[in-house]
């Protein structure tokens, strides 16, 4: 039999018979590894242990201790085990697909009756039976006629449709455990017992159209989470409990920040408290941008389709745009406009007004641009996923030689802003040229080198994502981790060689000839709406004092103190503090509870003693202890605390 050479991660190589499987390779290394192995990476591709290897290759054997590969297989097998459990309990249920998703898995079922919470408990119990049975997982490759005939005979029309959509040259792999079978690319574990029985949980049921098409049948999607051990599952469930407590929609009601309603899906109704937070944050961003040399512009929200066609967005983005048809007076045909989904084409129009010289560059142009994008109603989620939003958007027009300095400047600015807003660190992902791209290799070489060099002025710890840049330029993505461990992708920085060409942006170089500027797209917060949702949840509503909508409430203990309450509020207001009076005829404990639920950072109680001594009784949000403080000293302290970070004397400029 022909021999092949397999190279292991340590660089050693061994010869095996052609057609050897990873399971046989693992067993040849040690009996222990043969039992612990769950999958293998062969020439960079993840396969199950039954995959035959026919040619020289690199190979790495994985066990349950290999986080990424183990988690993928555990979650994948959980989806299949769940589908088997459902069909063993309800044999008439039809199965469709069940992929791995972040933190877990789901499977879509066609069942006449809705699944109930009690059903989820029964399914979990059946899954544990299947796991404890340790049924071996086996696989076969079938031809299309055999696979279609099998699923037609078993009344599984969704599987037949899936097979018919698979390219004819792609093998059809069938996986079994016990008597249950599914069509799947794999890979899978060696037996069902390799799934830890105490590390998964079924979470919820939701509706989902087959193939995401609202004209197709509505299915029932069961979601589950799965991890490598019980402790990881408990940690995740605790995080979900914390997330529920911090839900910005719940806190938004309690703090009277905003609401949303059916008549304007995906659009935010900002209340006075919420709008105060919004404008305070926007004012802060405006100052930070100004000190970094940005000019601020404002561009139209309704723009003729001609501009979107010229920019390329009409072809690529039309389904996400709100289209407006207008009967223009004396026009032969209707004017077709769109609400702008992004600001960049409009910024090029501003740039193009007047001749630009290389001496004018870099030109940093910012806008708090109101944008609208169509999102399916099922995808909308409070402030996190909306249709109408405002971006902290900016575009930098520069020469190729200026890319590195502008990138480094941006990263420093972003780092300062994130720190000011309570996020001490962030992660960077650097996405490089895709196979299909615009621009010459020389330009890409220069841009990628500039971005990487700029990153390294801040950190050497970044994630490289080869081939995942946009077709028009390399990009950086910035991720934050919040107080309960969730990651949020927020900031972006992207070089663009295409839009200046499409929209004919030029500058006069030192040689007197016209050149195309590079356009650097950048955002720090993303959208104000989403960022405020993240901020509310990160702080569980207890926003930094300078951002809190109501910074101080002064509450009377007795009605005789009402005038002093007003005097205290006036003194705080003169010092630039957002203060309110509460002189209702209610007990002080009632007032404290109500304003604590509303996340007011400081509550000042005023009674007869405070009035006579010109003091206040101070209570901080979340603290049980109170203290009596002189009014003048307190006003000075709170005024310093209310000062935005960029305006404090100890805060250096970006």
From Swiss-Prot:
Pfam families associated with the record: HGTP_anticodon, TGS, tRNA-synt_2b, tRNA_SAD
Cofactor comment: Binds 1 zinc ion per subunit.
Location relative to the cell: Cytoplasm
Reactions catalysed: tRNA(Thr) + L-threonine + ATP = L-threonyl-tRNA(Thr) + AMP + diphosphate + H(+)
Enzyme class of the recorded protein, top EC level: ligase
Organism: Dinoroseobacter shibae (strain DSM 16493 / NCIMB 14021 / DFL 12)
Molecular function in Gene Ontology: ATP binding; metal ion binding; threonine-tRNA ligase activity; tRNA binding
Enzyme Commission code: 6.1.1.3
Key words, A-Z: Aminoacyl-tRNA synthetase, ATP-binding, Cytoplasm, Ligase, Metal-binding, Nucleotide-binding, Protein biosynthesis, RNA-binding, tRNA-binding, Zinc
Assembly: Homodimer.
Keyword Amino-acid biosynthesis set for record: no
TGS domain location: 1-63
Protein residues bound to Zn(2+): 344, 395, 521
InterPro entries found in the cross-reference section: aa-tRNA-synt_IIb, aa-tRNA-synth_II, aa-tRNA-synth_II/BPL/LPL, Anticodon-bd, Anticodon-bd_dom_sf, Beta-grasp_dom_sf, TGS, TGS-like
Example of a GO biological process term: threonyl-tRNA aminoacylation
Protein name in UniProt: Threonine--tRNA ligase
Lineage: Bacteria, Pseudomonadati, Pseudomonadota, Alphaproteobacteria, Rhodobacterales
Task of the protein: Catalyzes the attachment of threonine to tRNA(Thr) in a two-step reaction: L-threonine is first activated by ATP to form Thr-AMP and then transferred to the acceptor end of tRNA(Thr). Also edits incorrectly charged L-seryl-tRNA(Thr).
């Amino acid at each position: 039999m022909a021999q092949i050479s397999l190279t292991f991660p340590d660089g050693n190589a061994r010869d095996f018979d052609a057609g050897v499987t990873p399971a046989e390779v693992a067993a040849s290394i040690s009996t222990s590894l043969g039992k612990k192995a769950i999958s293998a990476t062969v020439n960079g591709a993840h396969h199950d242990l039954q995959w035959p290897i026919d040619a020289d290759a690199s190979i790495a054997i994985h066990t349950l201790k290999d986080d990424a590969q183990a988690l993928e297989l555990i979650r994948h097998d959980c989806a299949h085990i769940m589908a088997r459990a459902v069909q063993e309990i309800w044999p008439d249920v039809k199965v469709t697909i069940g992929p791995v998703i972040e933190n877990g898995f789901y499977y879509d079922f066609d069942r006449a009756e809705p699944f109930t919470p009690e059903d989820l408990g029964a399914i979990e119990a059946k899954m544990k039976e299947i796991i404890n049975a340790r049924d071996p997982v086996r696989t076969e490759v079938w031809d299309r006629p055999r696979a279609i005939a099998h699923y037609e005979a078993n009344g599984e029309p969704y599987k037949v449709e899936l097979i018919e959509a698979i390219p004819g040259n792609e093998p059809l792999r069938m996986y079994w455990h016990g008597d249950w079978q599914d069509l799947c690319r794999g890979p899978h574990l060696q037996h069902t017992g390799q799934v830890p029985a105490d590390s998964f949980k079924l979470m919820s049921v939701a509706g989902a159209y087959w193939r995401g098409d609202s004209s197709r049948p509505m299915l029932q999607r069961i979601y589950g989470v799965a991890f490598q051990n019980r402790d990881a599952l408990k940690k995740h469930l605790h995080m979900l409990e914390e997330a529920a407590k911090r839900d910005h929609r719940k806190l938004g009601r309690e703090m009277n920040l905003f609401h949303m309603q059916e008549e304007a899906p995906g659009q935010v109704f900002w209340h006075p408290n919420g709008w105060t937070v919004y404008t305070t944050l926007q004012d802060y961003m405006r100052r930070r941008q100004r000190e970094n040399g940005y000019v601020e512009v404002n561009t139209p929200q309704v723009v003729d389709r001609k501009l979107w066609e010229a920019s390329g967005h009409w072809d690529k983005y039309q389904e996400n745009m709100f289209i407006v048809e207008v009967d223009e007076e004396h026009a032969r045909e209707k004017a077709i406009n769109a609400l702008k989904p992004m600001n960049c084409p409009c910024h090029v129009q501003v740039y193009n007004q007047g001749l630009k010289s290389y001496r004018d560059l870099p030109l940093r142009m910012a806008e708090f641009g109101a944008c609208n994008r169509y999102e399916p109603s099922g995808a909308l989620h409070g402030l996190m996923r909306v249709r109408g939003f405002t971006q902290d958007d900016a575009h930098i027009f520069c020469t190729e030689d200026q890319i590195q300095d502008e990138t480094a400047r941006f990263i420093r600015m972003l780092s300062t802003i994130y720190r000011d807003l309570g996020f001490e660190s962030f992660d960077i992902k650097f996405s490089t040229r895709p196979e299909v791209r615009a621009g010459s290799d020389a330009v890409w070489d220069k841009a990628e080198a500039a971005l990487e060099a700029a990153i390294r002025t801040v950190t050497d710890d970044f994630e490289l994502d080869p081939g995942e840049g946009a077709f028009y330029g390399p990009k950086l993505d910035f991720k934050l981790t919040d107080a309960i461990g969730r990651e949020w992708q927020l900031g972006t920085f992207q070089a663009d060689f295409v839009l200046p060409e499409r929209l004919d942006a030029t500058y006069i170089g030192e040689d007197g000839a016209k050149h195309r500027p590079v356009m650097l797209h950048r955002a720090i917060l993303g959208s104000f709406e989403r960022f405020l949702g993240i901020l509310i949840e990160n702080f569980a509503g207890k926003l930094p004092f300078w951002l809190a909508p109501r910074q101080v409430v002064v509450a009377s203990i007795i009605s005789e103190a009402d005038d002093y309450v007003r005097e205290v509020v006036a003194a705080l207001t003169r010092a630039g503090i957002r203060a309110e009076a509460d002189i209702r005829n209610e007990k002080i404990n009632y007032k404290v509870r109500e304003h604590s639920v509303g996340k007011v950072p400081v509550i000042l109680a005023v009674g007869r003693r405070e009035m006579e001594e010109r003091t206040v009784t101070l209570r901080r949000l979340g603290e049980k202890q109170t203290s009596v403080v002189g009014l003048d000293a307190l006003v000075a302290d709170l005024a310093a605390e209310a000062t935005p970070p960029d305006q404090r004397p100890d805060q250096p400029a970006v």
